């Protein structure tokens, strides 16, 4: 199902679907935890763990932060995260009340003609 941007607010932890995409494994290498949707205009797209286990927003790898919008993708309007510093949009679809599936899109997210797929689970 589609999801509204306001329903994405809060912190989420995530993982990737291993599909053979060139990005598979890269998020693990940087200690990716998930995403933090503070407001529709303030999103931390790459929340990672440092060596001490503390969470931080990795703006270096993410090339800044992001914002949330309602964007049409594959014929449906759904919550989508637009990166501030790179041509990437993550589109989200609701799986259940605490889980969404994400698909990375845009000229910076489409690698070899393939999308990167991931999931997010809402922190309690």
Regions picked out by a protein language model, each given a short descriptive name:
Residues 1-124:
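Soluble ligand-binding/transfer domains with enclosed cavities or grooves
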């Amino acid at each position: 199902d589609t999801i509204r941007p306001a329903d994405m607010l809060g912190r989420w932890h995530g993982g990737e679907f291993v599909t053979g995409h060139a990005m598979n494994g890269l998020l693990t290498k940087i200690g990716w935890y998930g995403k933090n949707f503070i407001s529709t205009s303030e999103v931390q797209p790459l929340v990672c763990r440092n060596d001490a286990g503390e969470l931080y927003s990795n703006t270096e790898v993410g090339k800044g932060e992001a914002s949330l919008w309602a964007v049409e993708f594959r014929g449906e309007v759904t919550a989508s995260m637009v990166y501030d510093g790179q041509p990437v949009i993550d589109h989200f679809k609701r799986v259940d009340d605490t889980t969404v599936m994400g698909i990375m899109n845009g000229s910076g997210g489409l690698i070899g003609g393939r999308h990167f797929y991931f999931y997010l689970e809402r922190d309690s």
